[in-house]
Amino acid sequence: MAPSTVAVEMLSPKEKNRLRKPVVEKMRRDRINSSIEQLKLLLEQEFARHQPNSKLEKADILEMAVSYLKHSKAFAAAAGPKSLHQDYSEGYSWCLQEAVQFLTLHAASDTQMKLLYHFQRPPAPAAPVKETPTPGAAPQPARSSTKAAASVSTSRQSACGLWRPW
């Protein structure tokens, strides 16, 4: 065994803690400095706009991060809460754009052309969506009989050549 290990093993717990404390403190400071550096990189554009050509201290970086978060939170609150219908529409539009982009990247086949034509048609008018009164609650599915749902599904399939799950 090395002499240093024997000496450490013979120390009391209080003495071990006294020796370990500077190492733990250095690790903590390194974590803090690393996080501040990451904040600086994330908010680099914000810093350039407010304080160009200045050396930023750690306190400046933290203050700027706090003000940026407050500003973005206030901006989100000013935009107002979105309804479930808006969220659904935005998600659907994004998904549709991704699908069209994917289809246009590859060589055009007959099926791809039909899909592109189908996606680019204007959507049929949708039934109004009822929102739940409590925020954060899951939307309740519409109650209908299976025969009515099946007849609507078959009429939609026969109306257009492509099957759609909606």
Curated annotation (Swiss-Prot):
All copies of domain bHLH, residue ranges: 16-72
Gene Ontology terms, MF aspect: chromatin binding; DNA-binding transcription repressor activity, RNA polymerase II-specific; double-stranded DNA binding; protein dimerization activity; RNA polymerase II cis-regulatory region sequence-specific DNA binding; sequence-specific double-stranded DNA binding
Main location: nucleus
Tissues in which the protein is found: Expressed predominantly in embryonic neural lineage cells.
Domain Orange: 88-119
Low complexity composition-biased segments: 142-156
Xref: InterPro entries: bHLH_dom (IPR011598), HES_HEY (IPR050370), HLH_DNA-bd_sf (IPR036638), Orange_dom (IPR003650)
Any one of the GO BP annotations: positive regulation of smooth muscle cell proliferation
Location of this chain's protein in the cell: Nucleus
Gene Ontology cellular component annotations, sorted alphabetically: nucleus
Ranges where the record places region Disordered: 125-166
Residue window of motif WRPW motif: 163-166
Annotated keywords: Developmental protein, Differentiation, DNA-binding, Neurogenesis, Nucleus, Repressor, Transcription, Transcription regulation
Signal peptide: none
Function (record text): Transcriptional repressor of genes that require a bHLH protein for their transcription. Plays an important role as neurogenesis negative regulator.
Annotated domain remarks: Has a particular type of basic domain (presence of a helix-interrupting proline) that binds to the N-box (CACNAG), rather than the canonical E-box (CANNTG). The C-terminal WRPW motif is a transcriptional repression domain necessary for the interaction with Groucho/TLE family members, transcriptional corepressors recruited to specific target DNA by Hairy-related proteins.
Oligomer status and interactors: Transcription repression requires formation of a complex with a corepressor protein of the Groucho/TLE family.
Protein name: Transcription factor HES-5
